[in-house]
Amino acid sequence: MGPTKYIIIAVVIIIICVILGLYIVDKKAKEKLSEASKEARRLKEEAERDAEAKKKEAILEAKEEAHKLRAEVERENRERRNEVQRLERRIIQKEEALDKKSEALENKEEALNKKQQKIEDVETHMEELHEKQRTELERISGLTTEQAKEFLLEQVRKEVKHETAVMIKEIETKAKEEADKRAREVITYAIQRCAADHVAETTVHVVNLPNDEMKGRIIGREGRNIRTLETLTGVDLIIDDTPEAVILSGFDPIRREVARIALEKLIVDGRIHPARIEEMVEKAKKEVEISIKEEGEQATFETGIHGLHIELIRLLGRLKYRTSYGQNVLKHSIEVSHLAGLMASELGIDPTLAKRVGLLHDIGKAVDHEVEGPHAIIGSEIAKKYRESALVVNAIGAHHGDMEPQSLEAILVQAADAISAARPGARRETLEAYIKRLEKLEEIANECEGVEKSYAIQAGREIRIMVKPEVLDDTGCIEMARNIVKQIESELEYPGQIKVNVIRETRAIEYAK
């Protein structure tokens, strides 16, 4: 056999093998397809079974849920029915209670109507009895109804008037005791903490001379030296028999101080003639001006007051040379400032404002001889001019009652001013003014009806009035004292305060036989 034959056999074998392989593959594929079909049918059957089971389960759950909902609805319906029944029972009970109350009210109304009728019957009977009694009383007393009313009203009026006077006296006494106690405490604390050291001053200065020959040199040839000094200073020089002394007299204390300084310098210098006098007077004026400024600054330093206008400080310094009833006005102002500040502290009020007003309250006295009007009003205008606050301006103007006080500080300064002025030894007045004041006091008292005698005692600080007991009763004495106080306050000027003491004495005398 040749190679071609082998090749053909090989090809045939290969073809046969391929055909067998294809057959085997096809067979296996058909087997797999059959198995897959079976598996698909199986899975489909299982899925159908599962779906049927779930459907049945869902239907069962839905039935159970419906059953639960039905049970819940039935329960709620039962509860609502029970609540409605309960409310119906309550309404029925309330209706029954209202019926009972209505019945009770009807019974009460009926009883009240009966009582009202009885009351009307009693009132009618009482009116009849009252009319009978009134007629009988008129017949017995001989007075008409109107006359009896007037008599009773007069009796009641007298009783009420007496009781009112007694009540007023008790209230006034109690209020005065309380007010006096508190005022004494405040004033005592203030006075204890304020120690003022100054004395009353006069309207004259005495200049000591080294010898009596100096008097002639002061007078000068034909009196030219003394005339020059008096003309330049406006002060009277009194040269009399008083050994080694010359008296300077004048009501302007600043001029008097200028004259004193100038005269003392002339005496020390020894050269006394008109030209030298004029030179010394000019020097003295400058010294006094410097002294005025220093005194004003010292006053503000002592009281702790700052921020004053320079002109107010100068006016304060001028007060050193001003007196009131012999009391130095600058020292008085400083004392009032301290007292007002201390009392303000005790009362819980701003002490700085009270001290400021106290220091400036008499500032008007520095120019009152140059400007017309009360010094309080002048002072308030000066304070306003130099831009002090409205409270300070008002307090200065109100410290003597010329203006209505608008602050507690104004009242405190009034009190401090009175305390400083009334302090024993602080002030004095001329004999003539003193006598006139005593006479006027007794005259005011004697003008009142029912006064038997009156005496001004305690240097005019008390008026003692003896009244006729048959003319005035105790109530009348109280009223008289109050009226006399008002009249004294309106008609008299006086330092401090005046006590009005009305005395009513009744004596009963019998003799045993």
Curated annotation (Swiss-Prot):
Belongs to the RNase Y family. The chain crosses the membrane at residues 6-26. Its main location: membrane. The gene is rny. Its EC number is 3.1.-.-. Endoribonuclease that initiates mRNA decay. It is an enzyme of class 3 (hydrolase). It comes from Clostridium botulinum (strain Hall / ATCC 3502 / NCTC 13319 / Type A). One of its GO terms (molecular function) is RNA binding. PANTHER family: RIBONUCLEASE Y. This is Ribonuclease Y. The keyword Cytoplasm does not apply. Keywords: Cell membrane, Endonuclease, Hydrolase, Membrane, Nuclease, RNA-binding, Transmembrane, Transmembrane helix. One of its GO terms (cellular component) is plasma membrane. One of its GO terms (biological process) is mRNA catabolic process. It is a single-pass membrane protein. It is found in: Cell membrane.
